Regions:
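Bacterial N-terminal signal peptides that target proteins for export
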Residues: 1-8
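C-terminal motif of bacterial Sec signal peptides marking the signal peptidase cleavage site
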Residues: 16-18
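Metalloprotease/metallohydrolase-associated module, dominated by Zn2+-dependent proteases
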Residues: 20-90, 106-143
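Active-site recognition of the HExxH zinc-binding catalytic motif
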Residues: 93-105
Length: 143
């Protein structure tokens, strides 16, 4: 196979990678006042500090949205972008989980601080365990 034949495939891959994350039906969102309180709690448990005002928030219609790991309730992107599924936009654990990604400025879920001391995973969360929206009864979405 010659290099010119590979060029269209390589360009398509590069273009797809350059497009970044796109959850679909999202809208910019003004964070509710309680988010500042949650941000402060997340700073306190993690020992990290950040600028709440730099975060750009988006809400995605529905109970979850497509992401690299399957279906997500929330997702953080570099550049201080947080996407939240509409059904989870007022769920403290989901929102704070994404806030913690922003404070860390990275993806991934190291046990410290996600598992301890912040307890911001499905397995470790000790706060409100409200019933899942009906669309999620087949399993929890990723964050």
């Amino acid at each position: 196979m010659s290099c010119p034949r590979l060029l269209p495939t390589a360009l398509a891959i590069a273009l797809f990678a350059a497009c970044g994350f796109d959850p679909g039906d999202e809208s910019p969102m003004t964070p509710p006042a309680v988010y500042r309180e949650w941000w402060e709690r997340t700073e306190a448990c993690s020992g990290l500090a950040g600028d709440f005002a730099r975060v750009r928030w988006s809400v995605v219609a529905g109970p979850s949205f497509p992401c690299a790991s399957g279906r997500c309730a929330g997702h953080w992107e570099p550049g201080h972008r947080i996407y939240l599924a509409e059904s989870w936009a007022m769920n403290e654990m989901v929102v704070r989980h994404e806030m913690l990604h922003d404070l860390l400025n990275r993806s991934g879920h190291p046990d410290v601080p996600f598992g301890t001391p912040c307890t911001l995973t499905w397995a470790t969360w000790q706060g409100d365990r409200a019933p899942l929206p009906a669309a999620l009864t087949h399993g929890m979405p990723d964050m």
